[in-house]
Amino acid sequence: MLEVKNLSVSYGAIEAVKDISFTVNAGEIVSLIGANGAGKTTTLHTITGLVPAKSGSVMYNGVDLLKTHNNKIVTLGMAHIPEGRHVFTRMSVEENLEMGAFSLKDQSDLKKDLDMVYGLFPRLKERRNQKAGTLSGGEQQMLAMGRALMSHPKTILMDEPSMGLSPKLVKEIFSIIRKLHEQGITILLVEQNAKMALSIADRAYVLETGRITMEGDAKELLNN
């Protein structure tokens, strides 16, 4: 489904990602773990066209993403939940969710899609008319996830969903990630919280200073 091959990314003279290769197969949760500054977010930004690659390839269901404009990538069935949530703070919860459906040609199922998201995140339904900027960090993370689901993704790239959340909320968010996986959504999960990420992933890659240093079955890495 997603194949990253010999990918290198630089910011000027600084090499952020150094010749990494990994795959995400349909139906998997694959985790990319590592410390802050390891190159995890840069990797996601390159996959989704926000940062140019220096070399390498990124193929998604036969499409070369490095040659695809970033506003077209969502139409291929890929959604990106960025680090820090990035909700539209002055818009209501429901308006934020509706923004997630902007790429869909057929808007006739909008209400059904909203009901689906509200079923997963009852708190968002309670706050649907509330400004997104007034939500807690956990609620904003739920909103970012719900907004991504509105585009009917086959694959979701999640960047640090646990960042800034209490342990209780982290468990809640990861429980929802499991539910999304059970619905058949493929997930590439970037996390500093290695224990939580490995506990739900099928496979994982460890990124250190821009290079993949370990890879394998998530449970085996968890016990390493």
Which functions belong to the PLM regions below?
Residues 1-224:
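Glycine-rich phosphate-binding loops of nucleotide-dependent enzymes
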